[in-house]
């Protein structure tokens, strides 16, 4: 089961508020300024892990993820604020925000499991392992660059905006 998926290295685990695509480096200061203004009304909050699941909702899963639990509404508010500001700059997001941390992606050309229901296998693998007490403080928004390589993505921090009252 696990050989058909490429797991995300722990240092790359993150929640994407909005994917921007290719961005000129000269735009980074303005992006950070717009993000800062858009989140000025949002204070730091606690976010907890939720349940494991997979995308898409039907058929063979391509992405294995863990959702968020307590604090998800505050995270959605943060995402809405950031997306609204970036949309005004011309960065349109065609997918609705789905709060999740990607754990693994199906490798290209990965085989089928035949009669095995992959989705149930994934959920059974994580049954009872959710950590509802695993929480952390959301105190900043990072602007990250993602460079894709055959071995996976490499992330570089381009900037950071603290939530008011955050570090």
Question: Language-model segments: which ranges?
Answer:
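Histidine-dependent nucleotide/RNA phosphoesterase domain, centered on the 2H-phosphoesterase fold
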Residues: 1-167
């Amino acid at each position: 089961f696990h050989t058909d998926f490429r797991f995300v290295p722990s240092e790359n685990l993150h929640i994407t508020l909005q994917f921007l695509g290719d961005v000129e480096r000269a735009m980074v200061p303005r992006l950070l300024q717009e993000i800062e203004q858009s989140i000025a009304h949002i204070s730091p909050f606690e976010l907890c892990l939720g349940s494991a699941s997979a995308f898409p909702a039907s058929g063979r899963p391509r992405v294995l993820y863990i959702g968020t639990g307590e604090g998800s509404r505050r995270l959605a508010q943060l995402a809405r604020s950031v997306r609204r500001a970036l949309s005004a700059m011309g960065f349109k997001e065609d997918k609705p925000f789905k709060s999740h941390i990607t754990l693994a992606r199906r490798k290209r050309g990965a085989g089928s499991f035949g009669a095995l229901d992959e989705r149930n296998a994934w959920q059974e693998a994580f049954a009872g392992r959710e950590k509802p007490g695993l929480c952390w403080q959301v105190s900043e928004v990072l602007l990250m660059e993602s460079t894709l390589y055959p071995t996976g993505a490499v992330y570089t921090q381009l900037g950071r905006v603290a939530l008011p009252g955050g570090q």
